[in-house]
């Protein structure tokens, strides 16, 4: 039971009267309930009837009561904090997803701790242990490329609710992801439809599930068109996911016969490819058609507006957070769901017809 609060002054009815700290019993008196009911509303809201819960929460707001999170942890209660572990916090894709997660959490009266794994399984494990020790309500996780099989026994032993973000794990877990194979097919089919029969796929984060599946989608589209992926598709893999990796990939492509259509595993790499081609005097879209993935905010405002596969990133983050809050509520009717969202191709100026 929570018996303490972070000191918060409340004024009495008039000037000159004593100012006291708001205590949990003050909230109980204001709401007309017991101290235990206030404690349950804070720690286990699913156990309290909605009308009673609303009355307690109204009293908390009116009095300015702030529950002592440290005391809650000591009693074994989870906090009103959820953890979010992503591969790269500066990635526009993950930034947009994180905003959606935060919005869903805020609507439920929770806050988010955003953590960066740097696509490193050791760092990821440390972050999971830290969040578990803080008794967060649950964790949203995009696993690193080298950690595709998580230690589920460790997670379940600590009863740490988890939802996988932009990743499918198993039917025993909740997950929200996007069909990356289908997205890549859309991109390459678009290039083939423009007459490009020699296509490159540039992926990053070697071994990263998303880019492995996008490579598979590119091969599927080539094969479905009756072409041989061994000759019609050039695959380039870079260690990272940024502009410099795209620039490096462009230099590698320029060393051989340059494909007339290039599909990149994300928009940031596509920007790097554009820069590398421009430095070599190769024009987009006149000489090479270029397609990205993610449709980040400034794809439409690039030097040559970028054709890109749009992911429903906002929906991805918001729905994942909702699933986590539902999963961590202890609701016996909760059923683990694996939600797969569909991407769409946004055609702009960077992809022109083959010459």
Task: Tell where the protein language model's regions lie, with residue ranges.
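N-terminal helix-turn-helix DNA-binding module of bacterial transcription factors
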Residues: 1-79, 354-355
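Hinge/beta->alpha junction and helix N-cap segments in small-molecule ligand-binding domains
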Residues: 69, 87-96, 114-123, 145, ...
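Flexible loop/turn connectors
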Residues: 251, 255-355
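Short beta-strand segments enriched in small/hydrophobic residues
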Residues: 30, 35-39, 74-90, 190, ...
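Alpha-helical recognition/docking segments in bacterial nutrient-uptake
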Residues: 1-19, 77-189, 193
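Short acidic/polar active-site loop segments enriched in Thr and Asp
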Residues: 34, 137, 196-198, 259-260
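Short acidic capping loops at alpha-helix termini that bridge into adjacent secondary structure
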Residues: 197-199, 229-233, 283-289
């Amino acid at each position: 039971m929570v018996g303490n609060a972070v000191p918060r002054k409340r004024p009495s009815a008039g000037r000159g009267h004593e100012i006291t700290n708001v205590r949990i019993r003050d909230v109980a008196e204001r709401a007309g309930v017991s101290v235990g009911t206030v404690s349950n509303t804070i720690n286990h809201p699913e156990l309290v009837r909605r009308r009673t819960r609303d009355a307690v929460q109204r009293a908390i707001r009116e009095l300015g009561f702030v529950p002592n999170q440290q005391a809650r942890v000591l009693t074994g209660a989870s906090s009103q904090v959820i953890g979010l572990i992503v591969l790269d916090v500066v990635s526009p894709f993950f930034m947009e997803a994180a905003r959606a997660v935060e919005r869903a959490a805020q609507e439920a009266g929770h806050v988010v701790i955003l953590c960066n794994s740097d696509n490193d399984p050791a760092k990821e494990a440390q972050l999971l242990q830290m969040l578990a020790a803080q008794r967060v309500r649950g964790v949203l996780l995009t696993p690193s490329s080298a950690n595709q099989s998580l230690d589920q026994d460790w997670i379940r032993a600590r009863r740490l609710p988890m939802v996988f973000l932009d990743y499918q794990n198993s039917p025993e877990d909740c997950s929200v992801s996007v069909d990356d194979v289908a997205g890549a097919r859309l991109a390459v089919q678009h290039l083939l439809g423009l007459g490009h029969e020699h296509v490159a796929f540039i992926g990053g984060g070697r071994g990263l599930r998303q880019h492995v599946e996008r490579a598979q989608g590119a091969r599927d589209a080539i094969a479905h068109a009756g072409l041989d992926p061994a000759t019609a598709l050039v695959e380039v893999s870079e260690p990272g996911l940024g502009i410099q990796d795209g620039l490096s990939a462009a230099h590698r492509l320029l060393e051989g016969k340059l494909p007339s259509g290039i599909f990149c595993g994300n928009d940031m790499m596509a920007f790097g490819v554009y820069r590398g081609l421009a430095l070599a005097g190769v024009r987009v879209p006149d000489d090479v058609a270029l397609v990205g993935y993610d449709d980040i905010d400034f794809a439409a405002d690039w030097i040559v507006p970028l054709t890109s596969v749009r992911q429903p990133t906002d929906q991805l983050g918001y729905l994942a957070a909702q699933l986590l809050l539902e999963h961590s509520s202890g609701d016996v009717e909760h059923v683990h769901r694996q939600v797969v969202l569909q991407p769409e191709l946004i055609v702009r100026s960077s992809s022109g017809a083959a010459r």
